[in-house]
């Protein structure tokens, strides 16, 4: 989402700087730290993933989450069969199983993630995919922007007051 938001803003550098400033230059190292800080009251707002926020909600926490107006990205989980696999038929059967409606439902519920199937509804409390402000950027543009975002974020993390 950071990359998509950066692409949707006038200046990626200014966007990162303002975000870091709003976070008091405190950069946590994991979504678990964000969740813990929200639950114990250290933070009233946290920047995290949809799955992490949904985990809090499904666990009964009184939290909500939003997506950046500038946009976000949806990177779906993937499964593959290795070329030259000595057990190709079994691997393809497992692939079919992982993509089945039942398996996708189990994964969505147990991991608070979205199904890769378009015919499987989002879990309770999650917005349908068509309502998300998804970036229209391609993978090459997103990859380049991610590298820039990482560099700018490291610079912001090293500024006065950084964690």
Question: How would you name each of these model-derived features?
Answer:
Residues 94:
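Substrate/cofactor-recognition hotspot
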Residues 122-163:
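Extracellular/periplasmic bilobal clamshell ligand-binding domains
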Residues 1-42:
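Extracytoplasmic ligand-binding site segments that recognize negatively charged/polar headgroups
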Residues 16-20, 27-28, 59-83, 97-120:
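Periplasmic-binding protein-like
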Residues 34-35, 52-53, 91, 103:
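Short, hydrophobic alpha-helical packing/hinge segments within bilobed ligand-binding/sensory domains
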Residues 4-7, 75-88, 106-107:
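A bilobed periplasmic-binding-protein/Venus flytrap-type ligand-binding module shared by bacterial periplasmic
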Residues 44-62:
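A ligand-binding cleft/hinge motif common to bilobed small-molecule-binding domains
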């Amino acid at each position: 989402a950071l990359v998509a938001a950066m692409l949707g803003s006038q200046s990626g550098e200014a966007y990162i700087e303002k975000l870091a400033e709003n976070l008091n230059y405190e950069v946590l190292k994991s979504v678990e730290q964000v969740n813990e800080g929200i639950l114990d009251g250290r933070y009233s707002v946290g920047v995290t993933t949809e799955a992490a926020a949904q985990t809090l909600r499904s666990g009964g926490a009184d939290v909500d989450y939003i997506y950046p107006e500038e946009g976000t990205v949806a990177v779906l989980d993937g499964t593959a069969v290795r070329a030259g696999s000595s057990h190709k038929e079994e691997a393809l059967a497992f692939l079919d199983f992982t993509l089945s409606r039942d398996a996708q439902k189990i994964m969505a519920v147990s991991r608070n993630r979205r199904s890769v199937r378009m015919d499987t509804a989002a879990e309770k409390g999650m917005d349908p995919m068509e309502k998300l402000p998804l970036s229209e950027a391609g993978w090459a543009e997103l990859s380049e922007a991610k590298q820039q975002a990482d560099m700018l974020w490291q610079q912001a993390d090293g500024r006065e007051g950084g964690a």
